[in-house]
């Protein structure tokens, strides 16, 4: 089994870029950024529970990474950079730390490296369980209205919240809930030590208004690019700034 994806071929010899979206996004999320790198092969993946992969069930990160590997093989992508946002960034970090073949570099935007104690994991497990129950039982417009009131999204304007709520409400609440539980931050190990030992380039992107993740970026051995005029979802709020950073990283 493989994940649904959209593949855009590039020029021979150019690096392949594999993009992983955030929770409740899909393969279209990174395209405004990725299409600026038309010389590179680009693969935009729908994670399980999302988009064209909505019906694919997973029990945890191991299943997601197995599906990611199978998808890369199916597209004959042998050497690549992983670029992931939030949930996609956490999947990318997990894959990198487990040693996914062919990975040349890692770019994470607003991805958490992991909680550091059992109390924090227990609290997060409880919180994610409550959200999952709401996704299963309530209208998605109501759930996402509240979702975007969380502190990490404090920099969003009312108009941005409204637009995101409308967009994300097109998802399937049941499959979102299942993926939220399977890949909860509570189920993710603390990756700091493993990330600090990576043998390939690791870069971290965060919005200048995203104080939480700017602080987390200092805890991993990554070169940090701060994206101006952006909060947690920097590639949506300032795609040109993210394009500039990726161009510097990839030296294109």
Swiss-Prot record:
**Disulphide bridges in this chain?**
none
Q: Does the keyword Lyase apply?
A: yes
Q: In the Enzyme Commission scheme, what number(s) does this protein have?
A: 4.2.99.20
Q: What is this protein called?
A: 2-succinyl-6-hydroxy-2,4-cyclohexadiene-1-carboxylate synthase
Reactions catalysed according to its record: 5-enolpyruvoyl-6-hydroxy-2-succinyl-cyclohex-3-ene-1-carboxylate = (1R,6R)-6-hydroxy-2-succinyl-cyclohexa-2,4-diene-1-carboxylate + pyruvate
Where does this protein come from, organism-wise?
Salmonella schwarzengrund (strain CVM19633)
MF GO annotations: 2-succinyl-6-hydroxy-2,4-cyclohexadiene-1-carboxylate synthase activity
Which EC class, in a word?
lyase
What is the annotated role of this protein in its UniProt record? Answer: Catalyzes a proton abstraction reaction that results in 2,5-elimination of pyruvate from 2-succinyl-5-enolpyruvyl-6-hydroxy-3-cyclohexene-1-carboxylate (SEPHCHC) and the formation of 2-succinyl-6-hydroxy-2,4-cyclohexadiene-1-carboxylate (SHCHC).
The record's subunit annotation is: Monomer.
One GO BP on record is:
menaquinone biosynthetic process
Keyword Lyase, does the record have it?
yes
Top-rank taxon: Bacteria
What pathway or pathways are given for this protein in its record? Answer: Quinol/quinone metabolism; 1,4-dihydroxy-2-naphthoate biosynthesis; 1,4-dihydroxy-2-naphthoate from chorismate: step 3/7; Quinol/quinone metabolism; menaquinone biosynthesis
Family membership: Belongs to the AB hydrolase superfamily. MenH family.
Supply the alphabetized keyword list: Lyase, Menaquinone biosynthesis
